[in-house]
Amino acid sequence: MDFISIEKGENLFWLGRYVERVYRTLNYLEGLYDVLIDTDETAYKEFCAALNIPDVYEDASDFMTSYFFDELNPDSVYSNLSRAYDDGILLRNTISTRSLAYIQLALDAMEDAKAEGSGALCSFEVIDRLLAFWGSIDEYLSSGQERCLVKAGRYLERLDLSLIHI
């Protein structure tokens, strides 16, 4: 039985949390995006309140742009994905370069969408990349202990978001 350092364990745990947070948030925002366009332009305020995110957005359009892409906003989808990537860089020898590449591809998809102005439409590609990441973790993370730490972070984040109905 190998020992895992506290730092490595934290990075594995938070990698799982950040990736799951982005995945779950994007899935939820797909439905919210339709509501914002079709019926209630202030529906994002409930989302912010549920996640305890400061409502610093001018309107629904500003929310969809800033909450998706603002790298200076610590609550944004992009910031969470960037933190997952930062943890992944530190763990590249553990999780494999291939697994890390899926997070990089998700970041690239977000950057391309921001440059093209396609906004929330990038969520499908990002979700696909994150699902590929989870499959890659199952395939290439050889240590059961390390895999369990990543999945513990994932499932705790899923539980946390489910409890607030996200």
Predicted regions and their residues:
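Alpha-helical transmembrane segments and their helix-helix packing motifs
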Residues: 1-163
